[in-house]
């Protein structure tokens, strides 16, 4: 079930360095929210904070509140593994388990949860391969290694793996940056289909992609080297690209910087 994300006064640190300053925003269910901005502005840091992935970096910490519906994912006693199960992530470069079969890649998360029934696993693999428009391309080689697929197919396989554990939210960190235009189009079409069931947040450097796939867009900016990134504005994507409120947003969209 798609859920809402709310950030309230979020500050992100790595040791003594403040990477992100005072971010508050809402990510609506069954929609696509795009994070845009120049390199180093904090958009990927904020994305990784949404499912506590930033915690793999020593010294990382968050101040403020991140709510999944009404649950604070940083509250004492909340298991980060459970958070990452509810809020899945697809990374910049496709990262299937290379020696694992296509079928086993999809159901890897279920196996970690203790599911062993072969029919359940097979049916699940087929269901989510169909859901990512990959089934017809791989149905005759399900036992072949996932690493043998093309880049675009590997990324769709990773998306199938991410949604097979039925998360509430799906995070995508530049999912098309290493793909060719045809594969990119396939991923973008898939995002449009997936938002009917999931809440999606995507980081992209491609402003045309943000305009094509997202319902709302958040623009992040870095005032100066060594200063924290911050959220400049968030609004409906059409408004951000046609009539932004902030001059910094207009300057970035128009190519004056970034």
From Swiss-Prot:
CDD domains associated with the record: ABC_PstB_phosphate_transporter
Source superkingdom: Bacteria
Pfam families, sorted: ABC_tran (PF00005)
Compartments, record wording: Cell membrane
UniProt keyword Cell inner membrane present: no
Enzyme Commission numbers on file: 7.3.2.1
Any one Gene Ontology cellular component term annotated for this protein: plasma membrane
Keywords: ATP-binding, Cell membrane, Membrane, Nucleotide-binding, Phosphate transport, Translocase, Transport
Signal peptide from the UniProt entry: none
Sequence positions that bind ATP: 37-44
ABC transporter domain ranges (all copies): 5-247
Membrane topology: Peripheral membrane protein
Gene Ontology annotations of biological process type: phosphate ion transmembrane transport
Catalysed reaction, written as an equation: phosphate(out) + ATP + H2O = ADP + 2 phosphate(in) + H(+)
GO-annotated molecular function: ATP binding; ATP hydrolysis activity; ATPase-coupled phosphate ion transmembrane transporter activity
SUPFAM superfamilies found in the cross-reference section: P-loop containing nucleoside triphosphate hydrolases (SSF52540)
Role, per record: Part of the ABC transporter complex PstSACB involved in phosphate import. Responsible for energy coupling to the transport system.
Subunit and interaction comment: The complex is composed of two ATP-binding proteins (PstB), two transmembrane proteins (PstC and PstA) and a solute-binding protein (PstS).
Family: Belongs to the ABC transporter superfamily. Phosphate importer (TC 3.A.1.7) family.
NCBIfam families named in the record: 3a0107s01c2
Name assigned to this protein: Phosphate import ATP-binding protein PstB
Organism name: Mycobacterium leprae (strain TN)
Higher taxonomy: Bacteria, Bacillati, Actinomycetota, Actinomycetes, Mycobacteriales
């Amino acid at each position: 079930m798609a859920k809402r994300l709310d950030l309230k006064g979020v500050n992100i640190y790595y040791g003594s360095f403040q990477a992100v300053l005072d971010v508050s925003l809402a990510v609506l269910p069954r929609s696509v929210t795009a994070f845009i901005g120049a390199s180093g502005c904090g958009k990927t840091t904020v994305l990784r904070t949404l499912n506590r992935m930033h915690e793999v970096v020593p010294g990382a910490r968050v101040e403020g509140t991140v709510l999944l519906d009404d649950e604070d994912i940083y509250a004492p006693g909340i298991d980060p593994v459970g958070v990452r199960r509810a809020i899945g992530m697809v990374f910049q470069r496709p990262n299937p388990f290379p020696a694992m079969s296509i079928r086993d890649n999809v159901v890897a998360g279920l196996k970690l949860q203790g599911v062993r029934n072969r029919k359940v696993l097979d049916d699940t693999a087929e269901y989510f391969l169909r859901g990512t428009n990959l089934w017809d391309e791989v149905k005759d080689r399900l036992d072949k290694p996932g690493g043998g697929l093309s880049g675009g197919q590997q990324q769709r396989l990773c998306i199938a793996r991410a949604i097979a554990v039925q998360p509430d939210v799906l995070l995508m960190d530049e999912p098309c940056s290493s793909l060719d235009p045809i594969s990119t189009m396939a991923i973008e079409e898939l995002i449009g289909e997936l938002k009917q069931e999931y809440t999606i947040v995507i980081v992209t450097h491609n402003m045309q992609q943000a305009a094509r796939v997202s319902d709302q867009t958040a623009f992040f900016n870095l005032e100066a080297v060594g200063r924290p990134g911050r959220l400049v504005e968030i609004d409906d994507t059409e408004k951000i690209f046609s009539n932004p409120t902030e001059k910094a947003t207009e300057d970035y969209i128009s190519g004056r910087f970034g």
